[in-house]
């Protein structure tokens, strides 16, 4: 994912 306000899963 990404480090920030929102977390996006690595797919």
Curated annotation (Swiss-Prot):
Cellular-component GO terms for this entry: extracellular region
Tissue note: Expressed in abdominal perisympathetic organs and abdominal ganglia.
Organism superkingdom: Eukaryota
Pfam families in alphabetical order: Periviscerokin
Cell location: Secreted
BP-aspect Gene Ontology terms: neuropeptide signaling pathway
Family listed: Belongs to the periviscerokinin family.
Protein name: Periviscerokinin-2
């Amino acid at each position: 994912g990404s480090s920030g306000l929102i977390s996006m899963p690595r797919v």
